[in-house]
Amino acid sequence: MKNLALVIEDDEDLSAIFVKAMEAAGYQVEAILDGQLAEKRLKQAAPRIIVLDMHLPHVDGATLLKQIHANPNFKDTKIILATADNVLAEIYRDKANIVLIKPITFSQLRDLSARFKF
């Protein structure tokens, strides 16, 4: 699916904001609230863009990020990391297209997401 975006964020309120922002940028969006569910979904499809929280239940964002980078199906997938942890942001900065420090506004994410469209 060319315009598929995954929002992998366990905070339901923040996830809803991310979903609306991605939809406003023209993506078909799926929200996933759990790292284990994200692992399963990533085996089924390679989205155009992923918004990835680093602190997730069951499987953390760092583990998902390693899996994404190890899979050639994701070579064109853009990654936006979202974290409130400045240390994690620095550690993983080179593994993502963009690292956002929470809190993140609707307009920030919408505008950044729109940059990655075909």
Residue ranges with predicted function:
Residues D53:
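Active-site residues of response regulator receiver
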Residues D34, D60-T63:
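Acidic catalytic/metal-coordinating carboxylates
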Residues P57:
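The feature encodes the CheY-like receiver
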Residues E9:
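Conserved acidic carboxylate
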Residues G26-L33, R41:
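Short hydrophobic/Thr-rich beta-strand motif most characteristic of the beta2 strand and flanking loop
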Residues T63, D85-K102, S107-D111:
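Alpha4 helix (beta4-alpha4-beta5 surface) of REC/receiver domains from two-component response regulators
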Residues A16-A24:
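Charged docking surfaces used in two-component/phosphorelay signaling
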